[in-house]
């Protein structure tokens, strides 16, 4: 026997088998596209058509309910308070430990220059001045051993003795310069010649002895010699 293939039932066959199962029309199909039943039944249909036309496009709900408000939210950096509590106290401590910047040089006030402190002047006694003058008549410069010996004798330091000799030498040179300048100013263009009959001029080192010196101060030690020397020099031109 040969078997023939059975044809599959088509649409007509399904209608014939289930004649009572007809497709039920949907509620949305009975009304215009995009209109709800309440909108379609309202008498002011002309006013609702524009809004109904807008609803013709499919509306898709967002995946998350809060996504529709993301565009209106502020950034996270601006939403945080500016003066809120510090989250990292170690960073604040490190900033506080940084040294503060000094003001610019233009903002600094000019400071007055510091005055140099002058050392107090040494006051010499009359006995010390007498010994110092005697030694100066003998020599104007002292070696280190001589200076140390003289300082120990007089109860002074070597620096005090050194400074006294320096001041004495400068005063002595100033006196000689004034004396030579005064002679040239009184007799310009003339030179003094000493005749054989004139008394010899005292030398610069022919000073009076220390016993005849006054004890009031070393400044008067050259007073007598200066007067005697100037009188002899002035008297020599008259004897020519």
UniProtKB/Swiss-Prot annotation:
InterPro entries: Distal-less_Homeobox_TF, HD, HD_metazoa, Homeobox_CS, Homeodomain-like_sf, HTH_motif. GO terms for molecular function: DNA-binding transcription factor activity; DNA-binding transcription factor activity, RNA polymerase II-specific; DNA-binding transcription repressor activity, RNA polymerase II-specific; RNA polymerase II cis-regulatory region sequence-specific DNA binding; sequence-specific DNA binding; sequence-specific double-stranded DNA binding. One of its GO terms (cellular component) is nucleus. Residues 117-176 bind DNA. The keyword rRNA-binding does not apply. Residues 80-120 are annotated as: Disordered. The keyword tRNA-binding does not apply. Residues 88-110 have a biased composition (Basic and acidic residues). It is found in: Nucleus. Keywords: Developmental protein, DNA-binding, Homeobox, Nucleus. PROSITE patterns: HOMEOBOX_1, HOMEOBOX_2. GO terms for biological process: cell differentiation; embryonic skeletal system development; negative regulation of transcription by RNA polymerase II; regulation of DNA-templated transcription; regulation of transcription by RNA polymerase II. It is linked to Non-syndromic orofacial cleft 15: A birth defect consisting of cleft lips with or without cleft palate. Cleft lips are associated with cleft palate in two-third of cases. A cleft lip can occur on one or both sides and range in severity from a simple notch in the upper lip to a complete opening in the lip extending into the floor of the nostril and involving the upper gum. OFC15 inheritance is autosomal dominant. This is Homeobox protein DLX-4. It comes from Homo sapiens (Human). The lineage of its organism: Eukaryota, Metazoa, Chordata, Craniata, Vertebrata. The gene is DLX4.
């Amino acid at each position: 026997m040969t078997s023939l293939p059975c044809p599959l039932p088509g649409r007509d066959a399904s209608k014939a088998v289930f004649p009572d199962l007809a497709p039920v029309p949907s509620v949305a199909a009975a009304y215009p596209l995009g209109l709800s039943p309440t909108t379609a039944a309202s008498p002011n249909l002309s006013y609702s058509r524009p809004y109904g036309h807008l609803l013709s496009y499919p509306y898709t709900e967002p995946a998350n309910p809060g996504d529709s408000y993301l565009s209106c939210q502020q950034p996270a950096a601006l939403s945080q308070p500016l003066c809120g509590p510090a989250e990292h106290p170690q960073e604040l401590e490190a900033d506080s430990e940084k040294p503060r910047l000094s003001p610019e040089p233009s903002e600094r006030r000019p400071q007055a220059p510091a005055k140099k402190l002058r050392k107090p002047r040494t006051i010499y006694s009359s006995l010390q001045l007498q010994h110092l003058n005697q030694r100066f008549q003998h020599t104007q410069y002292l070696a280190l051993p001589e200076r140390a010996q003289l300082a120990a004798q007089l109860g002074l330091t070597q620096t005090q003795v050194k400074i006294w000799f320096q001041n004495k030498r400068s005063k002595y040179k100033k006196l000689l310069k004034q004396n030579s300048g005064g002679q040239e100013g009184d007799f310009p263009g003339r030179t003094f010649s000493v005749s054989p009959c004139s008394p010899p001029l005292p030398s610069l080192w022919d000073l009076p002895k220390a016993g005849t010196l006054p004890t009031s101060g070393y400044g008067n030690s050259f007073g007598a010699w200066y007067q005697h020397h100037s009188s002899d020099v002035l008297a020599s031109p008259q004897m020519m």
